[in-house]
Amino acid sequence: MAFQSKLTSIYKACDSIEGLEESLTTLLYDDNNFKAYEIIYLVMPGEANSICLNDYLYSLEEIAELFDGRMKGKIIHFANTKILDLEEEEAQYFLDITGARAISGYGVTATANSYVLDKIFFELCQKEEYVTDVVEALFEKQYALCQLLDFRLYY
């Protein structure tokens, strides 16, 4: 997907919170292009407001604290391997703590693969300046798929 969309991609498997933290640190301090990345794409299982690493659930609040201000201006996007279902206060907490511009994902897990919609979403993020314009264009292009996967964006 990254190659087809001309996106910079870094693949790193993480099986523990320490592994995720190590990968984040490497990304932040060893990758000279980090500031240019608009989207941090996370493909990991989990439940509505948590991710699962090595059979342990970590809340998005814990993940926000791990990212602590280091995602300034980025969009954190979750594939549909986990549900993203946040209350307004939870979303705002995540955004405030991480510094992210938005958090996005799906209300439906892997009944259908989100690859096609993810690809279009990433391309639109490169073209559009405002996340509201991205979402509007995404729904115009793929309304049925957005509905099927229950696409969500909190900003």
Task: Describe each region flagged by the PLM.
Residues 84-155:
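Active-site-proximal C-terminal subdomain of hydrolase catalytic domains
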Residues 1-37, 72-79, 91, 95-98:
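A domain-level signal for caspase-like cysteine endopeptidase catalytic cores
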Residues 17-19, 46-50, 82-86, 109-111:
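Short acidic, S/G/P-rich loop/turn micro-motifs used as interaction or catalytic elements
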Residues 45-75:
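A short, glycine/acidic-enriched catalytic loop
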Residues 42-43, 54, 76-82, 106:
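Short His-Asn-centered micro-motif
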Residues 38-46:
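Short loop/turn segments at strand-loop or loop-helix junctions that form parts
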Residues 1, 21-26, 54-65, 86-91:
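Well-ordered, non-membrane alpha-helical segments in soluble/globular domains
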